[in-house]
Amino acid sequence: MNQSILSPFGQSEERAIAAINAFKQGNGVLVLDDEDRENEGDLIFPAETITVEQMTMLIRYGSGIVCLCLSDEICQQLDLPPMVTENTSVNKTAFTVTIEAAKGVSTGVSATDRVTTIRAAVADNAKPSDLSRPGHIFPLRAMTGGVLKRRGHTEASVDLARLAGYKAAGVICEITNDDGSMARAPEIVTFAQKFGFPVVTIEDLVAYRQKYDV
């Protein structure tokens, strides 16, 4: 990653701390992965505090595929099996079956309905029967060990939530440009400065976790 483009957001550790602090306040963070991986930026919010306004932003500026990243423990609690028996995707993105809240939603597509579904999934004592399958929220199972084991947005979102004191659950969506193409680092920086989001790389989070053993 070209560090100079990220200089407005500080050095690596400063970016990691700013991202964790933003999460603690229920605010969003833009996370960039490695250039030789997806080379994309995701807007991520803590699942426990997601609002309709934040969901609307994800839908408006993102790819439309809003994902709920969950620890393996939560996936087991909710009985969310893998979407497929054999995962042949390039980055082994661990989609589970899709979900909808069993109560309180209409079609499940609106920002309000999607927030209702996420709240049902991350509620205290949530159980499998609280969710219908399939639905319009795409859960992703994070690898145990987080970004230290897999340098993906899924693991980054769960790590950020955990480091901020939340349940291991984050809501993510890839940011796209106006022409529908994927936003890369330069566009992510512009987007972040326009809306006031911190930017952090997965490399930053790996370094922070390794330094502080967290």
From Swiss-Prot:
Question: What cofactor does this chain's UniProt record say it requires?
Answer: Mg(2+); Mn(2+)
**Enzyme Commission code:** 4.1.99.12
* Gene Ontology molecular function: 3,4-dihydroxy-2-butanone-4-phosphate synthase activity; magnesium ion binding; manganese ion binding
GO biological processes: riboflavin biosynthetic process
Reaction catalysed by this chain? Answer: D-ribulose 5-phosphate = (2S)-2-hydroxy-3-oxobutyl phosphate + formate + H(+)
Q: Does the keyword Lyase apply?
A: yes
Q: Which stretches are transmembrane?
A: none
Domain of life assignment: Bacteria
Q: In which pathway does it act?
A: Cofactor biosynthesis; riboflavin biosynthesis; 2-hydroxy-3-oxobutyl phosphate from D-ribulose 5-phosphate: step 1/1
Please tell me one Gene Ontology term that the record gives under cellular component.
Answer: cytosol
Please state which protein family the record places this protein in: Belongs to the DHBP synthase family.
Q: What does this protein do?
A: Catalyzes the conversion of D-ribulose 5-phosphate to formate and 3,4-dihydroxy-2-butanone 4-phosphate.
Q: Subunit arrangement? A: Homodimer.
Its name, as the record gives it, is 3,4-dihydroxy-2-butanone 4-phosphate synthase
Organism per entry: Pasteurella multocida (strain Pm70)
Task: Print the organism lineage.
Answer: Bacteria, Pseudomonadati, Pseudomonadota, Gammaproteobacteria, Pasteurellales
